[in-house]
Regions:
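Iron-associated oxidoreductase/ferritin-like identity signal
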Residues: 1-97
């Protein structure tokens, strides 16, 4: 699986690649946590527990957003793609050049 670790010898990887890997793995974990909390919220019958789970899920979304921003600042191509696709009302598939 993609989250299990490096696919190349770590000694062959630059510090920048290792840091980006760390950020990407962290982002994957945050998004996985959002998914798990969504499922827990749907299944939860106790109103007060459901409120806590919703709060926790939304915190994970904040963490994911912070990681996306870090990646954007470090990767100019990713930044360009985010600029093209985010915060627009154009159909998602109409962005191709």
């Amino acid at each position: 699986m993609a989250h299990e670790g490096y696919h190349e010898p770590i000694e062959d990887l630059s510090a920048e690649t290792r840091e980006m890997h760390r950020a990407i793995i962290s982002l994957m974990e945050e998004l996985e946590a959002v998914d798990w909390y969504n499922q827990r919220v749907d299944a939860c019958k106790d109103t007060s527990l459901k409120e806590i789970l919703i709060h926790n899920r939304d915190e994970e979304k904040e963490h994911a957003a912070m990681l996306i921003e870090w990646i954007r600042r470090k990767d100019s191509i990713f930044a360009k793609e985010l600029k093209d696709y985010l915060f627009t009302d154009k159909p998602i598939t109409d962005h191709h050049e």
